[in-house]
């Protein structure tokens, strides 16, 4: 651009040095009108993700929308809360306005300044290029037993990020290969129906759910629901090994590993599958089959609400006002993966409960990355790891903006929580597969 500006500057100087003829002045004015906007054009749209952002959650939706339009997005790790930046287009600016998010239109010089700041070796920042919108699937039942207050379903709808709901039928048919990212609904992969049988008010729901699940199992050639769920869990694990991205919350995390470990035994009471649990089940657990957890004790008591001692949420005595966990600060330039997954405008996140609230740190496998923990209680709330060519993330608790979850509760209205730090962690995982693979150094 400079090679065009220098001759023009020389021309302007001589045009005015002698007062300038009217024709020459008119020509200069016309040139300024036509070409000056090119020299001062808007280069980028910056979506800040610090405390200035009006709606953090919908900001992820805009970034996803830009990707679906075939455009790239730069994720600026640790810059103003993990901001997004993309090349300026009027339609992108319009979309930001429509969705009500905070954005800034910046020129070339400011874009270069930001990238120079991020590239400084002395600062804990980096940028990751997001290239293609991942195809999203949520593993959840399609009948009335779907958890309408599932946090992932709620936030995907609020952020206007498209997704498909798939369940056992689709997975057993091999449909997982169609997707880049899978969320596990708050499922019980052990075949014990989340141990709801004897909970007050759940008897009829338990009986109906059991009937539906057993019919599905028989249709696919399984004698027991637990055997069908085990096969589904193994297929999901294979999906991850092949390069898929797996995200699970609450009981979808611990029951997944429990089912895999118990693949060669029976941990289900007769009330759940028609025969008694194997008395030697504990000794037959195979922890080499799991993703995250090892050396845990299963709870085969049908009257207990616990699956195992992985979850420490049942025994903790912490008031809601004191229940917080802290995100780790990773090196953005070297620990790129956990840095992406922990981008947030708050580093201390308020806790929330669920069937699986918090993970016992002593039960984690070596190599598991703890991204969020309550150190004083020896519990991990947010963990990550690799399996084969894929990656997985487990997040304890049910609803980041609903401390106590009960069946039948009204789903959280995220328009009342547009800046939720806890929900941001979910959306970090949704965008994660869009990142250029060669940048993932961890």
Protein language model regions, located:
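Catalytic cores of eukaryotic secretory-pathway lumenal/extracellular enzymes that build
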Residues: 261, 270-272, 281-282
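Helical hinge/lid and interdomain linker segments adjacent to catalytic or ligand-binding clefts
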Residues: 44-45, 50-54, 85, 89-94, ...
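Catalytic beta-strand/loop cores that center a nucleophilic Ser/Cys/Thr
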Residues: 147-150, 155-157, 254, 265, ...
């Amino acid at each position: 651009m400079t090679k065009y500006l220098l001759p023009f500057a020389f021309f302007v100087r001589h045009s005015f040095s002698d007062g300038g003829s009217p024709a020459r002045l008119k020509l200069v004015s016309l040139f300024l009108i036509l070409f000056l906007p090119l020299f001062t054009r808007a280069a980028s749209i910056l979506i800040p993700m610090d405390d200035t952002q009006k709606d953090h959650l919908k900001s992820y939706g805009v970034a996803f929308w830009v990707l679906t339009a075939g455009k790239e997005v730069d994720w600026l790790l640790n810059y103003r809360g993990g901001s997004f930046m993309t090349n300026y287009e009027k339609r992108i600016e319009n979309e930001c306005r429509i969705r009500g998010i905070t954005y800034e239109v910046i020129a070339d010089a400011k874009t270069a300044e930001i990238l120079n700041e991020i590239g400084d070796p002395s600062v804990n920042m980096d940028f990751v290029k997001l290239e293609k919108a991942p195809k999203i699937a949520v593993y959840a039942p399609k009948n009335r037993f779907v958890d309408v207050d599932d946090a992932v379903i709620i936030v995907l709808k609020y952020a206007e990020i498209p997704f498909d709901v798939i369940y056992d039928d689709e997975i057993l048919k091999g449909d997982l290969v169609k997707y880049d990212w899978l969320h596990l609904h708050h499922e019980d992969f052990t075949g014990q129906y989340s141990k709801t049988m004897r909970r007050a008010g759940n008897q009829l729901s338990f009986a109906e759910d059991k009937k539906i699940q057993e019919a599905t199992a028989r249709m696919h050639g399984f004698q027991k629901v637990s055997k069908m769920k085990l096969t589904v869990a193994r297929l999901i694990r294979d999906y991850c090994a092949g390069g898929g991205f797996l995200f699970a919350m609450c009981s979808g995390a611990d029951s997944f590993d429990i089912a895999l470990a118990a693949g060669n035994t029976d941990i289900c009471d007769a009330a759940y599958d028609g025969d008694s649990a194997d008395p030697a089940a504990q000794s037959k657990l195979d922890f080499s089959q799991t993703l995250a957890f090892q050396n845990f004790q299963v709870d085969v008591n049908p009257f207990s609400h616990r699956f195992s001692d992985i979850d420490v949420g049942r025994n903790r005595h912490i008031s809601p006002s004191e229940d917080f966990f802290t995100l780790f600060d990773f090196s953005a330039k070297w620990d790129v993966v956990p840095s992406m997954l922990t981008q947030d405008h708050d580093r201390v996140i308020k806790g929330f409960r669920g069937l699986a609230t918090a993970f016992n740190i002593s039960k984690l496998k070596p190599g598991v990355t703890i991204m969020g923990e309550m150190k004083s209680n020896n519990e991990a709330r947010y963990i990550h790891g690799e399996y084969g060519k894929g990656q997985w993330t487990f997040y304890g608790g049910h609803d980041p903006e609903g401390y106590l979850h009960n069946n039948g509760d009204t789903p959280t209205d995220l328009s009342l929580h547009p800046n939720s730090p806890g929900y941001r962690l979910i959306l970090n995982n949704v965008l994660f597969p869009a990142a250029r693979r060669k940048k993932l150094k961890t």
